[in-house]
Design a protein with these regions (language model features):
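Long, continuous compositionally biased terminal/linker segments
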Residues: 34-71
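Amphipathic alpha-helical interaction segments
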Residues: 19-20, 48-49, 80
Length: 83
């Protein structure tokens, strides 16, 4: 989850395009990205409590090439991520 949905939305709008993904579904406080179907969601917590670190969580994305990984990384840095 995220505690700042508008900021998270702007970040993922910028970086998911580097993997060829687009917005597939969106709801108030939630958005799903993918190529043909939802592959990745980001949303504000539905229980109204603050988002927290998910112990043991893992997030991965499909990429077609190292060049696409590099483009995703560059887009993430440009959108405010840190190395």
């Amino acid at each position: 989850g995220t505690n700042d949905f508008p900021r998270a939305r702007a970040f993922y709008d910028a970086v998911m395009a580097a993997l060829g993904c687009k917005v597939i579904l969106e709801y108030p406080g939630a958005v799903a990205y993918g190529k043909l179907y939802p592959e990745f969601w980001v949303q504000a917590p539905i229980d109204g409590r603050p988002a927290s670190v998910g112990n043991g969580s893992h997030v991965g994305f499909f990429a077609d090439s190292k060049a696409q990984v590099d483009a995703f990384h560059a887009a993430a840095l440009a959108a405010g991520a840190r190395d």
